[in-house]
């Protein structure tokens, strides 16, 4: 046995009682997903046409697949992220932008329209007279070098995620 882990329980009289054990008989290795440091690295001057036209100087970035399902049903929780973003920055004098690098399933025009419809549905949850911050959809495939430019863009100040239920399911 390479390792033995015992689960102990505190009894009312103060004594400890063993309630289970885990024996690890074979060493395991965990290989975390890596990063290609030749591609993903700091850049001195980063420009990406898709982001350059965004008017805000401060933007949040979210990157993730917008899964199927209704509000609160996708693992990335993009709908809730947008709703919370609107709530936090509605009617503020200076508003940041939110850039969503996302798609639902494909990079098709129909998929893009579906993502825009979802954003609009969330926007419609708020009173019409509210001044809501801008949410930008960056839809489509980007190369690793373009993604690095996106991550390093001077307007992007913060990466945000409400993801839950993540795993290694490939």
Which sequence ranges carry the predicted segments?
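Short loop/turn motifs at secondary-structure junctions
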Residues: 24-27, 94, 155
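Conserved catalytic-core segment of nucleotide-activated headgroup transferases in glycan assembly
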Residues: 37-149, 153
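Hydrophobic/aromatic beta-strand patches that form the interior of the parallel beta-sheet core
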Residues: 29-31, 136, 158-160
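A short, active-site helix/loop in glycosyltransferases that binds the activated sugar's phosphate group
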Residues: 1-28, 37
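A short, glycine- and acidic-residue-rich donor-binding loop in the catalytic cores
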Residues: 80, 168-170
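Acidic donor-binding loop of glycosyltransferase active sites
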Residues: 149-167
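Short glycine-/acidic-enriched loop or helix-start segments at secondary-structure transitions
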Residues: 2-3, 72, 110, 170
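Carbohydrate-associated surface elements
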Residues: 34
